Amino acid sequence: MGVGRVTQIMGPVIDVRFNHDELPKINNALVLDVPKKDGTTESLTLEVALELGDDVVRTIAMDSTDGIKRGDDVKDTGRPISVPVGDDTLGRVFNVLGDPIDNAGPIPESVPREPIHRQPPPFDELSTKVEILETGIKVVDLLAPYIKGGKVGLFGGAGVGKTVLIQELINNIAQEHGGISVFAGVGERTREGNDLYFEMSDSGVIKKTAMVFGQMNEPPGARMRVALSGLTMAEYFRDVKGQDVLLFIDNIFRFTQAGSEVSALLGRMPSAVGYQPTLATEMGQLQERITSTMKGSITSIQAVFVPADDYTDPAPATAFAHLDATTNLERKLTEMGIYPAVDPLASTSRALEPSIVGQEHYDVARRVQATLQKYRELQDIIAILGMDELSDEDKSTVERARRIQFFLSQNFHVAEQFTGQKGSYVSVKRTVEDFKDILEGKYDHIPEDAFRLVGSMDDVLEKAKDMGVEV
């Protein structure tokens, strides 16, 4: 393979000149040895981003570029970055290059590796079957159900509970469905990745999970590509093993953010709000590979950070276009102590159709939303005039809506250590029955505080008994 020389270094972006007949292809991985202070050298991987002409390529570094100088030799590997795939990746933690970072020894040489850049599956191989994925989380299963093999976005600003919701979904789906999961940590806090790893080790879920991390402290190159590394591992389980896989990406906004960090250095003109002009293309290249084929499915659950709670920002707006279901987390609900803080009126799913979930489920979900919407409209009147000025019918609607609002909250298994309360998993069937009973007024005599942070109606009745209410 060809050998080039470093001609320019601009932070994470490095220009390399090759001989004319040895010019590497776009997306090829290049390697160079970087001297360290202790006299040793460390290998650094670069990825070719564009050709500048005059036999110079512009590359993005996957690690720190400290210690590199002009004139250093750079080798072309002749292929894109590739990561290990298959059963040997389960229970392990990797970086963007597929190197293990969990101190549990190297991956055997015999393990196959796949390039992280690939084409999406052709149209004639895609599956069109629609099937609901039960999560055990009431608000999700009732109002914005997830589709097996679909894409789900968890939208929310900073600190509203996206990562906790993802951790609960990993836990519930692994425990109840026993599926294989791949977790890609893209530009999030290292502490959260650490916590997640130890939680999953304690619960035994880690044995069925591969984890790939490119965290906040890493250069933009690693954060840009780590989602593709995780997706490549998931694709192998789908295409070769014929399995149903869950792909968790936390956070897809950081993927876009990393692209915008290097975009200007690559010489591209910024577009709206300073994002890269290739925003929609980059998002599409990732999202189009996440799909169900005749062989197996990839169901992806992606946390989407919303900068300054502004949903019109180009990054979350571009992600919206690719999703089958959205779970919107609302700061107002966290202030009321309702967790998960999912907004029942803003969250959507294309699966909430009578032909998919059944007529009863559909009717109950729509009645729940109508009751909550009516309550929202009456809140201004209540704030100005008080409850006494409402008609009897409106009073009854408000009281039921408050019970519904509290009953949409529940304790999570992954939050047990913080709350001291046991987590709960509620089946879709039970969820629909319980909400139907609340709407019909069966539980109007039970105080609304009994509905807070519970699982099924049995827990509410138990709580009411403890309060001294006649059940």
From Swiss-Prot:
Enzyme Commission numbers on file: 7.1.2.2
GO molecular function terms noted in the UniProt entry: ATP binding; ATP hydrolysis activity; proton-transporting ATP synthase activity, rotational mechanism
Keywords, sorted A to Z: ATP synthesis, ATP-binding, Cell membrane, CF(1), Hydrogen ion transport, Ion transport, Membrane, Nucleotide-binding, Translocase, Transport
Localization in the cell: Cell membrane
One GO cellular component, as annotated: plasma membrane
Listed PROSITE patterns: ATPASE_ALPHA_BETA
TM regions (residue ranges): none
CDD domains: ATP-synt_F1_beta_C, ATP-synt_F1_beta_N, F1-ATPase_beta_CD
The reaction(s) this protein catalyses: ATP + H2O + 4 H(+)(in) = ADP + phosphate + 5 H(+)(out)
NCBIfam families assigned: atpD
Subunit composition and interactions: F-type ATPases have 2 components, CF(1) - the catalytic core - and CF(0) - the membrane proton channel. CF(1) has five subunits: alpha(3), beta(3), gamma(1), delta(1), epsilon(1). CF(0) has three main subunits: a(1), b(2) and c(9-12). The alpha and beta chains form an alternating ring which encloses part of the gamma chain. CF(1) is attached to CF(0) by a central stalk formed by the gamma and epsilon chains, while a peripheral stalk is formed by the delta and b chains.
Main function: Produces ATP from ADP in the presence of a proton gradient across the membrane. The catalytic sites are hosted primarily by the beta subunits.
Record-given protein name: ATP synthase subunit beta
Lineage of origin: Bacteria, Bacillati, Bacillota, Bacilli, Bacillales
